[in-house]
Amino acid sequence: MSHRWKFILACTLLTTLPQAAYAWNSVGHMAVAKLVYDRLDDGHKKKLFTLLQSHPHYERYLAAGRPDNVSEVEWAIVRTSVWPDWVRPRGDKDSRGAEVTRYHRPEDHYVNVPFIDPKDAAVFAGKTLIDPDLTNILDALKQRCNEVRTKTTADIDKAIAVCWIFHLVGDIHQPLHNVAYFNDTKDYRRGDLGGNLFGVRAGGQRVKLRAYWDNLLGDDSNYADDSANHQARIFREALKVADSLRGLQLADAEQKKLADNTTFKSWSQESFELAKCVGYRQSDGKILAGVPAPFKGPIPEAAPEVGDDYIKTARATAEVRIVLAGQRLAERLKLVLGK
């Protein structure tokens, strides 16, 4: 057995134990949403669709650009999953205005759980590395689910909350959205922001580790392209991914996760363990080689290659996480929407 598979097996054992009580890109998020859509009964689809028609961006985004061969119900529901990324500010050239970007909640997409390089454990022992009062994806998911459950919540707010639930359940299953890597160097003493400051090469391409994982399921290099042709292409790519994963047989360990891990915290803990055991590990089990990368700007030329074994393992891990996200999100939606 290779060193990498030994680490994956160790992670599987860890994450199946009882837990103390930019995420996938558009392709990945919409693939999760499509898997969810196919698991919902007609009654829940109708209830979701009715709610979404109260959304402030229903005509402008959720229903916009629909291809002729896709029903409005399916198109709108699947696109809920990427709306929270669509409202992100796009810099000085963003002409959409505050009517769109006012809904942006940057801290809601992730939680920075510290992963300390084992060789530096003594350096960080006893230190508070992440402000415990910062809001994060766990808080956001609880709040949005409660908003949908509460009868007095206005339909417009429920529609917005539904979009966040679709998106954040996808995010919480992306390992790099649940971690921050620390080591005793000037570049990582405050963490790497979930791989956003960690540069590598994958297949010869320089990329931040976070972005590499976000893009594992498909390419959406021009996320700001709102044209109907581009959005239809992304939708088709997502359907291909969903179709390829629909018949994926989960291993017994993953089936046990579905049965045992039913809380947002337990889903995040699964992702954190995978980040430690797969996301930041080389094929020999050592911490992944990488170089400090600027949050904005080019990846340094010195970025090392992750290797074919890492690429294959990362892809396989992402596929399982997408399937788990789809099944869990479908069940959670049934719970919060009611009969």
Where are these regions (language model features)?
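Bacterial N-terminal signal peptides that target proteins for export
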Residues: 1-8
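N-terminal, motif-rich segments that launch catalysis or mediate targeting to/interaction with membranes
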Residues: 22-168, 175-339
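Bacterial N-terminal signal peptides
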Residues: 8-18
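Extreme N-terminus of proteins, especially the signal/transit-peptide cleavage junction
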Residues: 2, 19-23
